[in-house]
A protein has these predicted regions:
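Transmembrane alpha-helical segments that form core, pore/gating elements
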Residues: 49-52, 105-106, 111, 142-200, ...
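Signature of the 12-TM Major Facilitator Superfamily
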Residues: 39-43, 65, 93-96, 119-122, ...
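Juxtamembrane helix-entry segments on the extracytoplasmic side of multipass membrane proteins
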Residues: 6-10, 33-38, 42, 59-64, ...
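Hydrophobic/aromatic residues within transmembrane alpha-helices
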Residues: 31, 40, 44, 84, ...
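Cytoplasmic-side transmembrane-helix entry/capping segments in multi-pass membrane proteins
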Residues: 63-72, 117-129, 147-151, 171-181
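Hydrophobic transmembrane alpha-helices of multi-pass small-molecule transport proteins
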Residues: 46, 52, 108, 117-137, ...
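N-terminal membrane topogenic signal
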Residues: 2-14, 120
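Hydrophobic alpha-helical transmembrane segments of multi-pass membrane transport proteins
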Residues: 15-23, 27, 67-87, 107-108, ...
Length: 307
């Protein structure tokens, strides 16, 4: 790893990845115009797997971990997210609510690995939960209770995938995601056949236009291969404390992209809810680093000036 400060080229790369991940929610909405959600998710992971699996070495990870991650992220996170985004929640709100994964990850780590929850994490959770409550209370049709439940469950599945991935901290994440897709696509295809049916699958594929297939490829190549490859490259060269906080911008790009390209309204209550959730996320991610930084200031010395 190199210095904590990012060269501008590396910062631009990190912002590019965050922009891709955030505006990806707009791309999902475009793909869902013609494809059933489970089929769309299955195609996403099929093209993330093929042909990359023939060129990217399998990470030194147990098959059971790859299988668990593939099912949790594929069928759990994205399967449920795509279903929710058909008509139950707007792309902007989906990009925000799914960030609940950060708090579900803390809860699962506490329950499964006996990690101790810190006081600041309770504060962060309370702030984020308040934002979700605002969405439930003042929804304008851009989210239904079912949509929120589906996206929150998607966040829980994402958190489960995080816990599985943490068992292999040194694994190449791009290879991890590509090989785990081997266990994402088959169950999604099976669920699509079972719940969406062959007529809907056939109609979706035949009705899909160039924009739809571009959305599928963007999910696979842009969001998965480019995103994870560049993010992993940056994490290999800079401390995680420098790179990870930039992911807080994902819902910012998600809500802005949805407003610009899909015309999603951003009334005051929605911005307030976003502010609460984002503040909770920021406290969860940044507080330990800020506390550690200020702890290094000698007693009686002036604190560093605010930027």
């Amino acid at each position: 790893m190199t210095q904590a400060s990012l060269p501008w080229r590396h910062a631009a790369l990190a912002l590019a990845v965050v922009a891709v991940w955030g505006t990806n929610f707009v791309v999902i909405r475009i793909g869902l115009d013609h494809l059933p959600p489970l089929l769309f998710a299955a195609l996403r992971f099929t093209f993330a797997l093929l042909p990359a699996v023939f060129f990217i070495k399998r990470p030194n990870v147990p098959w059971r971990d790859l299988a668990a991650y593939g099912v949790l992220i594929g069928a759990g996170q994205f399967g449920l997210l795509y279903i929710a985004m058909t008509s139950h929640i707007s792309p902007g709100l989906a990009s925000l609510v799914v960030q609940s994964q950060a708090f579900f990850t803390v809860a699962l780590a506490m329950g499964l690995t006996r990690e101790r929850v810190k006081g600041f994490q309770y504060v962060a959770l309370a702030l984020a939960a308040s934002g979700i409550a605002v969405i439930l209370w003042r929804t304008d049709g851009s989210a239904t209770p079912l949509g929120l439940m589906l996206v929150l469950t998607a966040g829980l599945s994402w958190a489960g995938g995080n816990i599985v991935a943490r068992r292999s901290p040194d694994a190449n994440m791009l290879g991890y995601v590509v090989w785990a897709s081997l266990f994402s696509a088959p169950p999604l295809f099976a669920l699509s056949f079972a719940f969406e049916g062959w007529p809907a699958i056939q109609h979706g594929i035949l009705a899909a236009d160039l924009a739809t297939w571009a959305a599928v490829l963007w999910q696979s190549v842009g969001n998965t291969l480019f995103g994870y490859a560049v993010w992993g490259w940056l994490l290999a060269r800079h401390p995680a404390a420098t790179i990870a906080p930039m992911s807080l911008l994902v819902p910012v790009f998600g809500m802005a992209g949805s407003a610009i390209w899909l015309g999603e309204a951003l009334p005051g209550w929605k911005l307030a809810a976003a502010g609460l959730v984002m503040t909770g996320l920021a406290v969860n991610v940044l507080w330990p680093r800020l506390r550690g930084r200020f702890a290094k200031v000698p007693p009686g010395a002036d604190a560093p000036p605010a930027a």
